[in-house]
Amino acid sequence: MKSSGLFPFLVLLALGTLAPWAVEGSGKSFKAGVCPPKKSAQCLRYKKPECQSDWQCPGKKRCCPDTCGIKCLDPVDTPNPTRRKPGKCPVTYGQCLMLNPPNFCEMDGQCKRDLKCCMGMCGKSCVSPVKA
């Protein structure tokens, strides 16, 4: 097979592989609740992630960080969601290639102490703010 005939085949193969990922979560806006807090325990062996986004989890479950990896877990109600903490989120340079990265928080009120919920390179997480 000539290289010029191979190119269209490779393009079609790539599109066929990526198409299901592109529509993942389409038509769905938001799953209620937030991920439960991680248990303060040491992990001896990390497990392969069960999911990469909420839409890969059945029903109301969300894709959440757990003690030894990322799993589909039952969400909990949002604690004090309206509380906005002082400071600004640090500037993030770059972005991961994951289509729907898991968010470890949605709002400042979900973060402990003075941490803020900020968009990072790969989803939202609780981080130390920079002074405004």
UniProtKB/Swiss-Prot annotation:
GO terms for molecular function: DNA binding; endopeptidase inhibitor activity; enzyme binding; mRNA binding; serine-type endopeptidase inhibitor activity. Residues 1-25 form the signal peptide. GO terms for cellular component: collagen-containing extracellular matrix; extracellular exosome; extracellular region; extracellular space; Golgi apparatus; specific granule lumen. It is found in: Secreted. GO terms for biological process: antibacterial humoral response; host-mediated perturbation of symbiont process; immune response; innate immune response; negative regulation of protein binding; negative regulation of viral genome replication; response to lipopolysaccharide. Residues 28-76, 82-130 form the WAP domain. Induction: Down-regulated in response to low ELANE activity. Up-regulated by ELANE treatment in bone marrow cells. The keyword Signal applies. Changing R45G: No significant effect on inhibition of elastase, trypsin and chymotrypsin. Keywords: Antibiotic, Antimicrobial, Disulfide bond, Immunity, Innate immunity, Protease inhibitor, Repeat, Secreted, Serine protease inhibitor, Signal. Disulfide bonds join C35-C64, C43-C68, C51-C63, C57-C72, C89-C118, C96-C122, C105-C117, C111-C126. Pfam families: WAP. It comes from the Eukaryota. PROSITE patterns: WAP. Detected in blood plasma. Detected in bone marrow myeloid cells. Detected in airway sputum. Detected in parotid gland secretions. Detected in seminal plasma (at protein level). Detected in uterus cervix. The record marks L97, M98 as: Reactive bond for chymotrypsin, trypsin and elastase. Acid-stable proteinase inhibitor with strong affinities for trypsin, chymotrypsin, elastase, and cathepsin G. Modulates the inflammatory and immune responses after bacterial infection, and after infection by the intracellular parasite L.major. Down-regulates responses to bacterial lipopolysaccharide (LPS). Plays a role in regulating the activation of NF-kappa-B and inflammatory responses. Has antimicrobial activity against mycobacteria, but not against salmonella. Contributes to normal resistance against infection by M.tuberculosis. Required for normal resistance to infection by L.major. The pathologies of several chronic and acute diseases of the respiratory tract involve an imbalance between the proteases of cells involved in inflammatory responses and the inhibitors of these proteases. The inflammation-mediated release of neutrophil elastase in the lungs of patients whose levels of active alpha-1-antiprotease are compromised by genetic background, cigarette smoking, air pollutants, or a combination of all three can result in severe lung damage and a decreased lifespan. Interacts with GRN; interaction protects progranulin from proteolysis. This is Antileukoproteinase. It comes from Homo sapiens. The lineage of its organism: Eukaryota, Metazoa, Chordata, Craniata, Vertebrata.
